[in-house]
């Protein structure tokens, strides 16, 4: 039944499609029924490139199964003739895996000249992230060859992939910083790399692996087989970026000295990293001390997403913006231990590890934080409870695959994130001001469904006069209620004076107080008593 709801990770063959669509000269062929051809649709809708997805579905139908025929050989011949790829990756979807067919034998019947790589994975145990990591690691093992080191300091950027969260802008940000340092980019993989690029991966001095989800297996293989060094930190935020740059310079100089290469890299003035070469590379340090951002200090934030962004956003929000983290979690069970280790001392309670978006929605509704950083699922959940939310992790929707330059990494990324935090929360403050002072003629959407409860409908069989009398009479406690209390007009009016971003929680607290203390009707006095019971003035 889980597939009837939103899921955080795609299927295994979706992950395979992401790798195939990232690599030049590579084409994926999925042995799958018609319903499993959604990979092409997802890439066509979300990937902002002029190219069609590098994937084809070899459709399996009920008639084919009944007649004992197989379309895969014909599909392979068509793909070779039309796309002329250097490599074809063949994989079965979760549905056709149940047929337990010998793909090697079927592929052999195609008699094509193009090299075919069959990637078999158990789709019932492996999902998108693990499948993508496994395939990319396998391809690096297959194609990487011994190379002489480049004469000048160089790095590989390993991990960016098709449909990754802001990866195109992240790569641009990393390229800008490397150009400032005078460091060459040897290969970016898998995003935009070809098979020839995979072969020359060992020519770089250092591997940079900014994402926890993709690239670790490939980097570890390059370390074991070719003795390469790697950096696995994520330069998200000012402090992590500074630390990352200094470590990068230190490692490259050490590798150069070890291999007899000329390398005397030094940290340039920070202004060199800015767009104009004269100003600070990021406005975050001074902006956090401005009057506007001071109001964010100790605001409560909740973070959920993949491993990389959950860790990085928690640290950025607390360490650089001064926000209080009221909770965090990830949907990647295999990376949960790493996330816990990285966030030791940052969280008020245990890390949430779940693939059920309903659990996160309930937690958000219970905590009512000032800001949520999550996936598109959290964006939908927050909209229902009127909590400000910014999307900082996959899964995403089309509005998170932008044409402009919106990195998450580096100095540029710090500015983008700070802007998003500010505008996301600032709009919430604006709505509160409109609620408080009036809309001045603005057509601001009001929650029309939250009408003031009519006293006449308070309880079954109660007359309008009795209900009105109950609404205006002084609040008197009684035995705990078994039913739900009724809101009087003055109680509703007082509730609307409470800022919208804590209004729902205040309403729940008031109703709980009323039931526990026997108030059948919630008047303004009951709202005040609730506030006093919770320590409010």
From Swiss-Prot:
Residue numbers binding [4Fe-4S] cluster: 36
Cofactor field: [4Fe-4S] cluster
Subunit structure: Protochlorophyllide reductase is composed of three subunits; BchL, BchN and BchB. Forms a heterotetramer of two BchB and two BchN subunits.
Sample GO molecular function, one term: ATP binding
Annotated function: Component of the dark-operative protochlorophyllide reductase (DPOR) that uses Mg-ATP and reduced ferredoxin to reduce ring D of protochlorophyllide (Pchlide) to form chlorophyllide a (Chlide). This reaction is light-independent. The NB-protein (BchN-BchB) is the catalytic component of the complex.
Enzyme Commission numbers on file: 1.3.7.7
Co-factor note (free text): Binds 1 [4Fe-4S] cluster per heterodimer. The cluster is bound at the heterodimer interface by residues from both subunits.
Chain sites annotated for binding substrate: 428-429
Identification of the protein by name: Light-independent protochlorophyllide reductase subunit B
Catalytic activity: chlorophyllide a + oxidized 2[4Fe-4S]-[ferredoxin] + 2 ADP + 2 phosphate = protochlorophyllide a + reduced 2[4Fe-4S]-[ferredoxin] + 2 ATP + 2 H2O
Organism this protein belongs to: Chloroherpeton thalassium (strain ATCC 35110 / GB-78)
SUPFAM superfamilies registered for this protein in UniProt: Helical backbone' metal receptor
Pathway field: Porphyrin-containing compound metabolism; bacteriochlorophyll biosynthesis (light-independent)
